[in-house]
Amino acid sequence: MLGFSYVKSAAAILCVGCLAHCLAFAGPPVASLGHTRLQGAWTSSESAVFRGIPYAQPPLGPLRWKPPQPIALQPGVRPAIQPAPSCLQAFVGWNRADEDRGSEDCLYLEIRTPRVSRKARLPVLVWIHGGANWGGSGGWVTDSGLADRGIVVVTVQYRLGVLGFLSHPQLTHESPHRASGNYGLMDQIAALEWVKRNIAAFGGDPASVTVAGHSAGGQDLGLLLLSPRARGLFTRAIQQSGTAGFGLPPRTLAENEKLGATFAAILGVPQDDMQIETLRAVEARKLLDAQMLLESPSLADNSFIFLQAVMDGWVVTGPPAELLRTGKSAPVPLMIGNAAQELLLYGGDSAARRAVARIFGPSMDQALSLYGLRDGTQPPDDPILGSTAMQVAADDTFRCPAEFTAAAHAAAGQPVWRFQMERAAPGQARIDHGSELTFIFDNRPLNIAVDGVRPLLQSYWVNFIQHGDPNGPGLPQWPAYGGKRAYLAFTQSGPEARTALRAPICALLQRP
């Protein structure tokens, strides 16, 4: 039986420990940015979260279609608890929540950190959300469990649709760089500059910043990797189901200016010297209605219209394919991958045949043979890659562009780790677009069958964010891409190292 003095001593120690814990979290977390103190909130896991942090002036009125402008925060305490609105966006079927809470005043970021201390110097992840540059937001990633594994997580809002990617001759003329059309990318660059200046106040290391993006976020990150404007702002990159160009033909500045003139005509704005000023005065929701009528002559599907890279000569200095081939990508470690069944192509094998003719051109016959479509028979579905139509769509838009990006980056002497997700997210029948996101970022409980997958994927991602290499103790080896074009397949039975993903098909495409 324990003596009374032992029990009393143990109780005293427990009380002291509890008191120290309570004192540590007695007040809200505060990050000091010069004369401004941002007041956040503690999470249930005792990390700190700061929301609604402006990184640029609201792009309203005369600042519509202008590069992001620096913002000076007022001295004193500023609450950073309420989420910022999503960037204004048209409803396109999957983004109702973000569309409902959208605002043109949206240039904010969120931060979740394990320690609010300048001495912590923790690695940083900056997340660029997807959504075809039409819609979406990234706040849900702020609530991921990565902060509980020693990562400072930052999510960025950026202008979307015509508000983020419109060119116009008058906009080009008023620019000191004679460029227009990449305001959404400029927002991302401004956010990265803000992170470099200020992340130490939140416990982050400005010399250890990884940028990750999914879908359009992966495409935008690919363009940032190629842009001299973003050079030196991050040290590692993770492109998930998105590459610079997405295999789509880029638009020249002149082509995007022509699209801008068409946009003004749709709105009935007079074609005069004040056209852009008149457009700046148009109610924002009317702009969104008009953007739904825009068409790009080089696209088979206009839902990709804001995924076509705009070669403005300032942010994007040339065709992404050429920039990649000539070694213009930033010299940083890269993780890049895709899901096995990224995209549906409606219409079955007949649609697949039409797509092959359009995509492969002079190599059409070879491609038809590789897909098993040449003799007019209907090939069986692949258990991992899905139907033939699904394979064609994913190869063209995701899988082969990721291969080309990995190969170009490796040829420039940079370390590359390539992956393909080959297991569905919980509750999903298909290994579709974003299948890996649930395992990496979602904090909700998973069923027993997939509980082991989350720590595995999170460990690979955390290791890469920390060290630029996903490998670590206790993990199956993930070989670098290198000359063998190695990749890791995340299968139903676990990770499998393989080589030369879809090599015969991708050799016929040869475009990023």
Predicted regions and their residues:
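Substrate-gating cap/lid region and adjacent catalytic-acid/histidine neighborhood
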Residues: R236, A244-G245, T278-A281, R285-D451, ...
